[in-house]
From Swiss-Prot:
Belongs to the elongation factor P family. It is found in: Cytoplasm. GO terms for molecular function: translation elongation factor activity. Involved in peptide bond synthesis. Stimulates efficient translation and peptide-bond synthesis on native or reconstituted 70S ribosomes in vitro. Probably functions indirectly by altering the affinity of the ribosome for aminoacyl-tRNA, thus increasing their reactivity as acceptors for peptidyl transferase. It comes from Bacillus velezensis (strain DSM 23117 / BGSC 10A6 / LMG 26770 / FZB42). The lineage of its organism: Bacteria, Bacillati, Bacillota, Bacilli, Bacillales. One of its GO terms (biological process) is peptide biosynthetic process. InterPro entries: Elong-fact-P_C, NA-bd_OB-fold, Rib_uL2_dom2, Transl_elong_fac_P/YeiP, Transl_elong_KOW-like, Transl_elong_P/YeiP_cen, Transl_elong_P/YeiP_CS, Transl_elongation_fac_P. This is Elongation factor P. The keyword Protein biosynthesis applies. One of its GO terms (cellular component) is cytoplasm. Pathway: Protein biosynthesis; polypeptide chain elongation.
Length: 185
């Protein structure tokens, strides 16, 4: 059991029969009344986000999530195949389970598979990935004074707003938490 006062972003808890990851939290101490913790939780089974308020000091169960490092091999229809790098055991995940992460997945990429009591919950991507630009408008010389951006489509289909100097064929470093441009690789 863990106190809600000890909430941290990324903590995994069991509440109301579900497995939830803390996305955001805020300790609130009103002038009148008892303190409480307002939290935003993501259900790891369904991906749904729910806001929940806990009384300060309330205890919740901490979910024991195991992570396995696996390599993404290929897509077979709406099934995506991953391989355990130590045992060579293969695991298939449905497209619905990894819908958000598909925009960043490349073949042979290493990812962490999250498991709870032998049930696969989803995947955890690295903080940044390198993606190749396949389609973007050419940059116009002298158009950089405003520091603007233009859309660029990557090899996975993700559209990222990039600076004007980025061209087709360039490799970008993209933040996987929000899909934003970090730098050129």
């Amino acid at each position: 059991m863990i106190s809600v006062n000890d909430f941290r972003t990324g903590l995994t808890i069991e509440v109301d029969g579900g497995i939830w990851r803390v996305v955001d939290f805020q300790h609130v101490k009103p002038g009148k009344g008892a303190a409480f913790v307002r939290s935003k939780l993501r259900n790891l089974r369904t991906g749904a986000i729910q806001e929940k308020t806990f009384r300060a000091g309330e205890k919740v169960a901490k979910a024991q999530i195991e992570t396995k490092t696996m390599q993404y091999l290929y897509a077979n229809g709406d099934q995506h195949v991953f391989m355990d790098t130590s045992s060579y055991e293969q695991l298939e995940l449905n497209e619905n389970q990894i819908e958000e992460e598909l925009k960043y997945l490349l073949e042979n990429m290493s990812v962490h598979i999250m498991m709870y009591q032998s049930e696969t919950l989803g995947i955890e991507l690295p903080n940044t990935v390198e993606l190749k630009v396949v389609e973007t408008e050419p940059g116009i010389k002298g158009d950089t004074a405003s520091g603007g951006t233009k859309p660029a489509k990557t090899e996975t289909g993700l559209v990222v707003n990039v600076p004007f100097f980025v061209n087709e064929g360039d490799t970008l470093v993209v933040n996987t938490s929000d899909g934003s441009y970090v730098s050129r690789a």
